[in-house]
Amino acid sequence: MASSLDALKARVESLLGDHLESATIDRGELTIVCSASSIAVSCQLLRDQAGFDQCIDLCGMDYSTYRDGLHDRPRFAVVLHLMSVQNNQRLRVRFFAPDDDFPVVPSLIDVWASVNWYEREAFDMYGIVFEGHPDLRRILTDYGFVGHPFRKDFPVSGHVEMRYDPTEGRVIYQPVTIEPREITPRIIREENYGG
């Protein structure tokens, strides 16, 4: 297995050349990092010349809590999982949005049509804008939803809650009414164990 991964790594490195920032084999998978400016060209090369004809997943990542010196890249990344059926191989592709405040990356819908809803989900959950996407709108949250819930700075309790009001006969929005509570851990001493 390692020899086939090494061969795939060498092939991808020669195919992508300067478009490739890094390629690592970890836990039995090859992960490559490309720049956002060259991701469309890189993905077309991977599809047309390396046989990665299917994008089986696309997701967003928020690395804002990795600011401890170990992670010196931008905050938001997009991760693709590609599959080559003819070669029986998988590949993880990662690229970072250059701007942390307003993450914009190119859409890959022209390369793989299957990324349509994946890109909409990453936009809805993380606020990553896919430039060139024909229908980039929310897919999981409500139309009037404020913010992006998978961002690390989004409050756990949210901004508003919805509930059904029987007097009005409809669903209403109201500010979150969660009271903070103090949780005290319970200590069980050894002498109190049964037995």
Curated annotation (Swiss-Prot):
Catalyzed reaction equations: a quinone + NADH + 5 H(+)(in) = a quinol + NAD(+) + 4 H(+)(out)
Gene3D superfamilies tied to this protein: NADH:ubiquinone oxidoreductase, 30kDa subunit
Primary subcellular site in the record, as a coarse category: membrane
Keywords: Cell inner membrane, Cell membrane, Membrane, NAD, Quinone, Translocase, Transport, Ubiquinone
Membrane topology classification: Peripheral membrane protein
Coiled-coil region: none
Record EC number: 7.1.1.-
Annotated InterPro entries: NADH_DH_suC, NADH_quin_OxRdtase_su_C/D-like, NADH_UbQ_OxRdtase_30kDa_su, NADH_UbQ_OxRdtase_CS
Assembly, per entry: NDH-1 is composed of 14 different subunits. Subunits NuoB, C, D, E, F, and G constitute the peripheral sector of the complex.
Role of this protein: NDH-1 shuttles electrons from NADH, via FMN and iron-sulfur (Fe-S) centers, to quinones in the respiratory chain. The immediate electron acceptor for the enzyme in this species is believed to be ubiquinone. Couples the redox reaction to proton translocation (for every two electrons transferred, four hydrogen ions are translocated across the cytoplasmic membrane), and thus conserves the redox energy in a proton gradient.
Protein name per its UniProtKB record: NADH-quinone oxidoreductase subunit C
Lineage: Bacteria, Pseudomonadati, Pseudomonadota, Betaproteobacteria, Neisseriales
Gene it is expressed from: nuoC
